[in-house]
Amino acid sequence: MENIQERGHLLTEQINPNSQNLDQLSTVELVDLFNTEDAQTLKAIAQARIELAQAIDVTSKALGKGGRLFYVGAGTSGRLGVLDAAECPPTFCTDPDMVQGIIAGGAAALVRSSENLEDRPQDGAEAIAGRKVTEKDVVVGISAGGTTPYVHGALNAAKQRGATTIAMACVPAEQVPIVVDIDIRLLTGPEVLAGSTRLKAGTVTKMALNILSTGVMVKLGKVYGNRMIDVSVTNTKLYDRALRILEELTELSRQEAAELLDRSGKRVKLALLMHWAELDAEVGQLLLDNHHGNLRAALQAGQNS
């Protein structure tokens, strides 16, 4: 019993005075309370904007040089990291190895709670070793309360291997100091249901991960304007989206867009370059490869040649 760490002082564990009578509210009052409290997530993101921007810049540079991005967490934090990583291949046509989610307990913990596994820092360290993390990589440790041993074990192992380390926590640094390269604090206050960090802490973490991964992909040239030009055309919904992107950006008819997409091998970015620079698929792809997949740079080079 004497080895159990007292966490009552942590912001995420404190009692929210606004929800003291949660069990006595009408249903509409309960919904209104959640809505009011969730507004804190927007403020938290705004307060962490500089650190988020730093994380985007550092990570995009690392990935642009062949590095990888790892999210590490347990419970809700781990699931959110895995979710964000899983969305990168279909949205940005990235290799599944480029952005990876690591959760305490592995795949089984995605659907069944394995909270006891978060107390093993050695497991976090072993997960980093198993991925052969190097100085080229970026490791983001996600922990709402900032104290998760599994996450700390992973971050410490990543530092020893020379990787860039980023922390994402929902408690002030003075409550839980974490020695990392970039320290992102997302302070949303005590939860409506005391200690349930799947609520505001989970929501703000998802928002931050959305911004981080999307920002990185923008910097890597996987977006043109606000269109996902590296979308992986793997089902009818995404095929339709690819066609609409081509129609909107080229003013081609839907049939013409479909023919262009087919000639490009269903690669939207290449299709755009082929159309705008009047190139065939082979030359267009070579031009993209020579400009690290950046459409604007490849287009400028193609038009100047």
Curated annotation (Swiss-Prot):
GO terms for molecular function: carbohydrate derivative binding; carbon-oxygen lyase activity; ether hydrolase activity. Keywords: Carbohydrate metabolism, Lyase. Residues 59-222 form the SIS domain. Gene3D superfamilies: 1.10.8.1080, Glucose-6-phosphate isomerase like protein, domain 1. The keyword Lyase applies. InterPro entries: Etherase_MurQ, Glucokinase_regulatory_CS, MURQ/GCKR, SIS_dom, SIS_dom_sf. The keyword Lyase applies. It catalyses: N-acetyl-D-muramate 6-phosphate + H2O = N-acetyl-D-glucosamine 6-phosphate + (R)-lactate. CDD domains: SIS_Etherase. Its EC number is 4.2.1.126. The active site is at E87 (proton donor), E118. A lyase-type mechanism (elimination/hydration) is suggested for the cleavage of the lactyl ether bond of MurNAc 6-phosphate, with the formation of an alpha,beta-unsaturated aldehyde intermediate with (E)-stereochemistry, followed by the syn addition of water to give product. Belongs to the GCKR-like family. MurNAc-6-P etherase subfamily. Specifically catalyzes the cleavage of the D-lactyl ether substituent of MurNAc 6-phosphate, producing GlcNAc 6-phosphate and D-lactate. Homodimer. PANTHER family: GLUCOKINASE REGULATORY PROTEIN. This is N-acetylmuramic acid 6-phosphate etherase. It comes from Crocosphaera subtropica (strain ATCC 51142 / BH68). The gene is murQ.
